[in-house]
Amino acid sequence: MLTKIIAKASCKTNVPRPESEICDSMADVALKAIEKAKLTIDDIESIGIGVPGAVNPKTGVIEYSANLFFHNWQVVKMMEERLNTKICVENDANAAALGEYLAGSAKGAKNAIAITLGTGIGGGIIINGKIYSGSNYAGAELGHMVIVKDGKECACGRKGCWEAYASATGLINLTKQEILKENFDFSYMLKSCDGDINKVTGKTAFDAVLAGDANAKTVIDEY
């Protein structure tokens, strides 16, 4: 099996926005990557899409995605209309787990679990070489295990999910909370984002720790 990456392209998701606009962006990115690889869409037998949330790969529908703010998104149908080739969709962490199983750190294993960290926390489970999705296609949504009773609110609507604490989104929210504390005289964290709290990223607190910001250390210690 050929597993070499031969071209890359990317763009910002910029959610929330309409499904059609996101599909337009994904189609553009796919075509750019194909062009970089010196191929055409006619050379492509199929395209795979990895998406956070509960994904039904049989129907091609994203049933629910907390991070993309969509319900019952018919992504396969919409993308096939744009690219005129076979499209497959799977939960992003499931796809990552399968990739590790086929060609990565889990190659040669019978069973595997992968955990992805980014905007949220995802999980993928491989059993006997096959993706385990569970009865509701959310069997490996490890980020939505409740670790703190009545804890921080999560994007999924529950409270105390692991994702609310340990994802990049959780870190950004924690950084903002520390910046906004009362009697906060000076913060390298705030200075590094030009005084605009909306510019806080997952790197803000780490960069501030290296600059000697004690409040940033508090953020990292809690994270």
Functional labels for PLM-detected ranges:
Residues 26-47, 86-87, 181, 185, ...:
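Phosphate/pyrophosphate-binding loops at sites that engage ATP/ADP/AMP, CoA/4′-phosphopantetheine
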Residues 1-6, 114-131:
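Gly/Thr-rich phosphate-binding beta-strand-loop-beta motif of the actin/hexokinase/Hsp70
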Residues 43-48, 112-116, 122-124, 155:
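Short glycine-aspartate micro-motif
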